[in-house]
């Protein structure tokens, strides 16, 4: 009877452990290969001959280490010998063999390494003994399976995500869109992974099904996939007795993944080839981070921007989950790993932890958290095994010992497709970890059919009661990366969603979209011992948002446990968008020791600083909240914004344009003024503007070149979507907002580098026009200048002002 692939893999794992230390060709090669045959159920010692006498190409006598006529030739060497020489030696034996005896596979081996050559194709693959279980399909003919053609497989990476994206685009262009398209892509993703990881048996069943059971022009691929999905959703005992045997070999998957009947997709030759091309990749090596990249590469750019999606590297995800729970769990394990009773209780604790991401996207945070929890569980099992009476046993059935499962993980995602990706991603990483355990303990196992499922809800997190997904009393940790959208970038629907959460909070109109998750998390965690941590744009700890958000967090009795101060957050997707972020961990409990992660370089690693308290500005200081103030606390001049052109560039000139205009129209020189935006002031560059405040309409019309520019301003303003700008097209010779003082003033750029010790300031006379990228202090004195350039004022500014990315944003409030 032919062994199934799971049994073969289990035997291969045990074989790898048994022969891990073998090295001597003379004494150990023969028992090594006899044991190797038993992996495939071959116990008859006479199928192959050891030390077969053969004549080499030059007529000299040689000895083939192992020969199975028509099937296999092996040249074996002691550990560490040159395999290239061994290959040449093995090929040299073939010249004088009868054609009927020529082997299908030639294998050279030194105990630690294998090199397998497929003689029909000439292709070769190398692997190490410890990875034999991954390559058993190459030896399928030994167990009665057809020869598995060797393919060079590239690891799945961002290119694979983009390849799936092209398939998505082709299907969409053919008219296959919406929900059906999204579900189809998720199913294909699962099938590609299952084909390379032992879920589908034999390996590459999915690829073979497409190649052998569908037409090359793709005309019946849609119906073929529909039939396959139906089989994957039907238990083996309930399948039709006359089912195609190639379909019947696919395992029942369950998990409701293949439950819904989809409309049939129409494929072309190119689309079928694209799917087969994807089959050629090594999906067993998929990184959990790929799912965010996959989603991002196939989403519409506009939709991605509107959702504020940021798909993140594992390094950045670990910045959040390590201080939230992982470091503490690892420390506890190190304390108790020598005590079996305590290990048992700790393992029980791991099984009971729950994780909730209320803005889970494609599930990156949940996937990495699950993987790390399973890695820790593996350490627990290894430590327990080493303390048990079974220490030294090569194969251990651990299937009943694995307790951590995907049903401990919960999420909310507003879009259907990423919600589906998140669920499948957790199943896939679960299978990856099961393979890790299989290698560790020498016995293959897989959790198929899918019994447990993650609790991912497709819903609007700002409108759903989170307790419907996971009751707060059952939640251990809340975590994630909610969308970052400043007030000016929020859609009307998003503003309404946020208003539903913050309607009773004074001043909430200034809040970033992400603040809705902070406030809902605080309400959710109130009165519990659970903890939360979110990645956020750094603006929530700067400027006018601070008093509003953190005042509410104080009212809800939240305490900050740890914080990463501003750093540059990058993602794994195309374009690698960089955002300046913070991470804030908080909860209802107030731990005695807290941690602040500081960054000398926002692109570099942090260093941890122990703190007694962490305030709203993420420093170890009293939690004083500075509210927005419109009226100064003492008698000082008002700080106002500079004048705003809203001209499309037509009223502004560089030096060459100024000279050309004066040459063409000398009378225009009277109306040209020096113009200072923030860039011109900071970098000492020259710019000019047409300042036609006192120029009559008649005089403007007498200057045709000036009139062309005025007309361009008019057209630009009329084309605007802003109603006030359209109205102001009627005064197109003027800046839209005129705030120029009639006296000298102190110019203050709104944005300047965080690397400066102080905000750059400068005195200007009233003839120099100040642009709206600056603020102005009219009638300023040296006293005002001294205060604003003082170390005290700039220290205050650095910790409390708003920022653009990491640059200082200086305002008049």
Spell out what each predicted region is:
Residues 1-105, 119-122, 147, 733:
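A short, conserved, highly charged catalytic patch centered on acidic carboxylates
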Residues 2-18, 129-372, 408, 412-421, ...:
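Preference for the N-terminal adenyl/adenosyl cofactor-binding alpha/beta module
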Residues 22, 56-62, 79, 83, ...:
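Signature of N6-adenine DNA methyltransferases within the class I
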Residues 702-734:
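Amphipathic alpha-helical
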């Amino acid at each position: 009877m032919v062994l199934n692939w799971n049994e073969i893999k289990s035997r291969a794992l045990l074989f790898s452990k048994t022969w891990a230390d073998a090295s001597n060709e003379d004494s150990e090669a023969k028992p090594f290969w006899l044991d190797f045959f038993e992996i495939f159920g071959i116990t008859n010692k006479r199928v192959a001959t050891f030390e077969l006498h053969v004549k080499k190409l030059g007529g000299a006598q040689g000895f083939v280490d192992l020969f199975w006529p028509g099937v296999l030739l092996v040249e074996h060497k002691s550990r560490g010998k040159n395999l290239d020489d061994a290959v040449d030696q093995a090929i040299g034996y073939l010249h004088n063999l009868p054609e009927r005896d020529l082997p299908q596979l030639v294998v050279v081996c030194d105990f630690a390494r294998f090199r397998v050559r497929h003689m029909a194709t000439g292709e070769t693959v190398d692997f190490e003994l410890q990875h034999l279980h991954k390559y058993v399909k190459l030896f399928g003919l030994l167990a009665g399976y057809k020869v598995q053609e060797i393919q060079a497989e590239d690891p799945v990476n961002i290119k694979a995500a983009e390849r799936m994206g092209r398939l998505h685009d082709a299907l969409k262009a053919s008219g296959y869109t919406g929900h059906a398209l999204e579900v189809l892509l998720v199913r294909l993703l699962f099938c590609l992974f299952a084909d390379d990881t032992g879920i589908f048996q034999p390996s590459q069943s999915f690829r073979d099904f497409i190649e052998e059971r569908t037409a090359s022009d793709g005309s019946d691929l849609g119906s073929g996939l529909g039939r396959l999905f139906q089989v994957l959703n039907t238990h083996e005992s309930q399948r039709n007795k006359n089912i195609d045997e190639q379909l019947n070999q696919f395992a029942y998957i369950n998990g409701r993944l293949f439950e819904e009947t989809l409309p049939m997709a129409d494929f072309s030759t190119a689309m079928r080839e694209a799917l087969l091309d994807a089959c050629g990749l090594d999906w067993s090596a998929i990184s959990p981070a790929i799912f965010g990249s996959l989603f991002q590469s196939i989403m519409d750019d506009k939709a991605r921007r509107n959702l504020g999606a940021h798909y993140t590297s594992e390094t950045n995800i670990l910045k959040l989950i390590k201080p939230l729970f992982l470091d503490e769990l690892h420390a506890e394990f190190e304390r108790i790993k020598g005590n079996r009773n305590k290990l048992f209780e700790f393992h029980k604790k791991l099984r009971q932890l729950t994780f909730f991401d209320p803005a889970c996207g494609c599930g990156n945070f949940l996937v990495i958290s699950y993987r790390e929890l399973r890695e820790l569980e593996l350490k627990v099992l290894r430590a327990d095994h080493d303390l048990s009476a079974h220490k030294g046993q090569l194969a251990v059935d651990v299937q009943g010992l694995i307790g951590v499962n995907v049903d401990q993980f919960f999420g909310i995602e507003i879009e259907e497709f990423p919600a589906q990706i998140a669920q499948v991603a957790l199943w896939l990483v679960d299978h990856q970890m099961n393979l890790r355990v299989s290698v560790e303990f020498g016995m293959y196992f897989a959790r198929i059919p899918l019994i447990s499922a993650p609790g991912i809800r497709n819903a609007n997190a700002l409108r759903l009661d989170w307790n419907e997904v996971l009751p707060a009393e059952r939640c251990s940790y809340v975590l994630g990366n909610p969308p970052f959208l400043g007030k000016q970038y929020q859609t009307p629907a998003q503003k309404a969603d946020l208003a539903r959460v913050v309607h009773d909070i004074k001043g909430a109109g200034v809040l970033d979209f992400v603040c809705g998750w902070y406030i809902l998390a605080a309400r959710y965690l109130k009165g519990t011992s659970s903890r939360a941590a979110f990645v956020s744009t750094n603006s929530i700890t700067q400027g006018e948002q601070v008093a509003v958000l953190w005042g509410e967090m104080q009212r809800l009795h939240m305490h900050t446990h740890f914080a990463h101060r501003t750093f540059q957050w990058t993602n794994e997707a195309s374009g690698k968008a960089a955002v300046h972020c913070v991470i804030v961990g908080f909860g209802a409990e107030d731990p005695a020791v807290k941690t602040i992660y500081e960054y000398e370089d926002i692109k570099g690693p942090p260093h941890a600083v122990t703190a007694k308290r962490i305030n709203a500005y993420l420093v170890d200081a009293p939690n004083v909240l500075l509210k927005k103030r419109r009226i100064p606390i003492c008698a000082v001049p008002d700080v106002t914004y500079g004048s705003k052109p809203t001209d499309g560039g037509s009223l502004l000139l560089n030096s060459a344009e100024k000279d050309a205009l004066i040459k063409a129209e000398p009378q225009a020189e009277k109306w040209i003024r020096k113009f200072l935006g923030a860039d011109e002031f900071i970098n000492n560059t020259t710019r000019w503007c047409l300042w036609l405040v006192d120029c009559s309409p008649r005089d403007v019309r007498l200057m045709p070149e000036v009139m062309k520019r005025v007309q361009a301003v008019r057209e630009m303003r009329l084309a605007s979507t802003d109603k006030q700008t359209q109205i102001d097209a009627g005064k197109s010779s003027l800046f839209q907002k005129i705030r120029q003082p009639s006296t000298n003033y102190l110019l203050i750029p709104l944005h300047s580098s965080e690397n400066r010790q102080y905000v750059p300031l400068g005195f200007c006379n009233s003839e120099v026009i100040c642009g709206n990228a600056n603020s102005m202090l009219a009638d300023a004195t040296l006293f005002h200048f001294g205060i604003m350039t003082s170390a005290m004022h700039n220290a205050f500014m650095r910790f409390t002002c708003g920022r653009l990315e990491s640059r200082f944003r200086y305002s008049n409030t």
